Every structure is written in C-alpha cells, then in structure tokens.
C-alpha cells in the first residue's frame, strides 16, 4: 500500500541556509543579466553570425528559464522568508508550484539535449562542412521546439501523484507519495547514467572528428575550430560532472557509503554544483571566445592603454 505524506510546507522550511540562498540569488541575477546581453548580441550582432552561436542561444534560453524555475521549485521552498511569495503565486495561479516542481525534471532533460547539441554541431561541421551552417541557422528554432517536445514527453512519464503542492484552507501543503517518489528518483538515476555515457561517447567522437579537421584547414579556421571545441568540451565536462554527482547520490541512497550526516552536505552541494551547469556558459565564453572577451574588455583595455607612457 502506498504511503501518502501530507505536510504543511512551512514545517519543512528553515533559515539554516538562508545566507546561501541569498548568495545564489545574487550571483544568479548578475549571471542572468549577462546571459540576456549575450542573447541579444547573438541575435542581432553580425560578429556572431556563425551557426554555433545559434546552439549557444538555445543553451542560454534553457539555462535562464531553468534558473528562474529553480527559485520557485527549490530555493523559495526552503525558507520561511519566501512563504508569502509562494502563497501569493499559488493563490493567483493554482497549480503553479506543482508545475514548477515538475519543471525541474523538464530542464534536466532539456539541459542535456542542448549540451549534447553543441557536440552534434561540432561533428556536423566535419561531416557536412558545406551545408551544416545553413541548416543550423535556418532550423535552430524548430530544432529547439522538438527538443522541448521530447523533454516534455520524458517528463510526462512521472506519475502526477508522486509530489504536488496545493493550497488548502489558506495553508500551503506538500503531498508526496513515498513509493512513487522513490520510483521517480530511481528512474532519474538511470537517466543520469545513460546521459552520462551518451555525452561521454559523443564527446570522444567529437574530439576525434575535430582533431582530424584541424590538421586539414588553414590557421585561421584552425583557431576557430579549436575555440568552439574547447567551449563544447569544457561545458560538456561540467555537465558530465553534475550527472556523475547525481549518480553517486543515488548509489548512496542504497549502499549508504557516506554517513547520514552527509545528507545535508550532499543536498547543499548539489544546489551549488547545479549552478555550475546552469550559470557557467557565459563565463566559459568569456574565457575562450576572443570576440566576446574583446567586446566586454574593450573599455578596460582603452583605459589601460592611456596609462602607457
């Protein structure tokens, strides 16, 4: 028989990690603004007309929406300070918090597909050097709609009764089905394992193809290929690390190779590590993309140049 647990949401809240949430919201807001600026530049600046930037647009859009959703599905649900905000949202849009909670799983899939797409783009630049740019530039919006559809489909297999948040008699309550929740966690541990293997294999294939191409092109094209490959590999490496961490947490639930006291540390570190994939892309671009670095550091360089005797 299924175990149904009904708990007022405020009983699960505490002020224990309030400082961490505030810090995450601070750097998250700054990074989202940075990502919005990059989105604008990629869409309208001719300097970023290459098709790879269309894939980066998809990544940025996904990560912006994921970060916004995490406020309501994770961060605000941990602290009493934000309870009035959650109550207002649920009263205004009934079912909003339950949808937001399921959104965590939607973005789990979508972030994987967009990270994988960066590798697929790099491979297609070698296998179809003539037509790949036109294809990605022309169809990237339709491609993103398809990725969203697949992610929604994968998320829809979750039973609705596993976890939901409702307003009852003026109180927010969390309703969870223990057996269904365990099943969901097991399914996503399998997803994490499969996605990790896929990303690793595609990454290796991407390195193989790009290394062959680099030897056959001009110096200028070689620099561009290496830059885009570095961006793809670093981003893929970070995302693989998040998947591996999720797999380790799933294994720990069964084998308990870490003390129970580590549970709190695990959960807190998962939130921080999740930010690595959600918020890291603009900084990876700033490090490895000379065009972006010049654009944002131009004013600083000019000031420095004036001080040279």
UniProtKB/Swiss-Prot annotation:
Gene Ontology molecular-function annotations: transmembrane signaling receptor activity
One Gene Ontology CC term in the entry: membrane
Protein's membrane topology: Multi-pass membrane protein
Transmembrane segments: 22-42, 140-160, 190-210, 230-250, 272-292
GO BP annotations, alphabetical order: sensory perception of chemical stimulus
Pfam family membership, one: Srg
Top-level taxon: Eukaryota
Keyword Ribonucleoprotein: no
Subcellular localization, as worded in the UniProt entry: Membrane
Listed InterPro entries: 7TM_GPCR_serpentine_rcpt_Srg (IPR000609), NRL-Serpentine_Class_Gamma (IPR052880)
Alphabetical UniProt keywords: Membrane, Transmembrane, Transmembrane helix
Gene3D superfamilies tied to this protein: Rhodopsin 7-helix transmembrane proteins
Family: Belongs to the nematode receptor-like protein srg family.
PANTHER family reported for this sequence: SERPENTINE RECEPTOR CLASS GAMMA, SERPENTINE RECEPTOR CLASS GAMMA-RELATED
Name recorded for this polypeptide: Serpentine receptor class gamma-47
Gene, per the UniProt record: srg-47
């Amino acid at each position: 028989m299924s175990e149904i647990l009904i708990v007022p949401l405020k009983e699960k809240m505490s002020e224990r990690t309030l400082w961490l949430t505030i810090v995450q919201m601070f750097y998250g807001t700054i990074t989202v603004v940075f990502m919005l600026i990059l989105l604008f530049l990629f869409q309208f600046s001719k300097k970023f007309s290459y098709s790879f930037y269309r894939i980066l647009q998809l990544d940025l859009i996904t990560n912006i929406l994921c970060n916004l959703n995490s406020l309501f599905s994770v961060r605000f649900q941990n602290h009493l300070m934000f309870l009035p905000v959650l109550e207002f949202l649920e009263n205004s849009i009934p079912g909003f918090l339950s949808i937001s909670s399921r959104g965590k799983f939607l973005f789990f899939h979508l972030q994987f597909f967009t990270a994988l797409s960066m590798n697929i783009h790099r491979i297609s630049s070698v296998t179809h050097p003539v037509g790949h740019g036109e294809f990605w530039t022309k169809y990237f919006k339709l491609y993103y709609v398809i990725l969203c559809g697949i992610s929604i489909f994968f998320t829809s297999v979750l039973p609705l009764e596993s976890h939901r948040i409702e307003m009852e008699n003026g109180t927010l309550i969390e309703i969870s089905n223990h057996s269904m929740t365990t099943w969901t966690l097991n399914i996503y541990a399998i997803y994490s394992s499969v996605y990790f293997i896929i990303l690793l294999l595609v990454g290796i294939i991407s390195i193989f193809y790009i290394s062959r191409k680099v030897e056959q092109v001009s110096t200028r094209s070689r620099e561009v290929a290496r830059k885009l490959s570095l961006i793809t590999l670093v981003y893929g490496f970070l995302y693989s690390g998040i998947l591996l961490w999720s797999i380790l947490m799933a294994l720990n639930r069964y084998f308990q190779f870490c003390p129970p006291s580590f549970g709190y540390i695990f959960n807190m570190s998962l939130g921080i590590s999740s930010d690595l994939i959600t918020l890291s892309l603009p900084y990876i671009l700033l490090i490895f993309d000379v065009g972006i670095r010049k654009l944002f550091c131009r004013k600083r360089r000019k000031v420095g140049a004036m001080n040279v005797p």
